[in-house]
Amino acid sequence: KFKIYHPGGNIGQTLLLVKDIMIKERNKIPLINFNSNIVTAIKTISKKNLGIGIIIKNKSVIGIVTDGDIRRGTKNYSKKTKIAVLMSRKPLYVGENTSAAKALSIMAENKITSLIVSSDSDYKKHKVFFKPKGILHIHSLLKYGIK
């Protein structure tokens, strides 16, 4: 409980895990069906306000798409184009028991602002397709003082 009640302290920061601060609520996670078109993806990404969409097929992650990917892609594709055409395959992700500090380090190294969160068993097996448990945005890390 120390990590929850004292998140701003050095000890609290090192104890916080991704699962403690990730977005877990399904209605807040930007999930997009792989058959959706660009317009549907834009609406979902805008509504969830994270700048990213998680592309799902059969309840498993198959890729991601960012608002920047869509902006660049609309020059070459119609609004009816399936979002799977624009997605990045094999997105970076972390297990739910990864330290928040490690997650921030991964984001900084890869110049990204969000990480998909999986179960630890999927993460340890390095699964290509996995069920998302949540999403971690850099703003959540900063809110808890993770550096």
Q: How does the language model describe each region?
A:
Residues 14-29, 80-91:
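Bateman (tandem CBS) regulatory domains
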Residues 1-16:
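YjeF_N-associated NAD(P)HX repair module
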Residues 61-64, 126-135:
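Glycine-rich acetyl-CoA-binding "A-motif" of GNAT/NAT acetyltransferases
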Residues 52-54, 59-91, 96:
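Helical hairpin unit composed of two closely spaced alpha helices linked by a short loop
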Residues 6-9, 25, 140:
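Glycine-rich beta-alpha junction loops
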Residues 13-16, 23-27, 40, 46-50, ...:
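Short gly/pro-enriched beta-turn/loop segments at secondary-structure junctions
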Residues 31-49, 74, 93-121, 129-131, ...:
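The conserved cystathionine-beta-synthase
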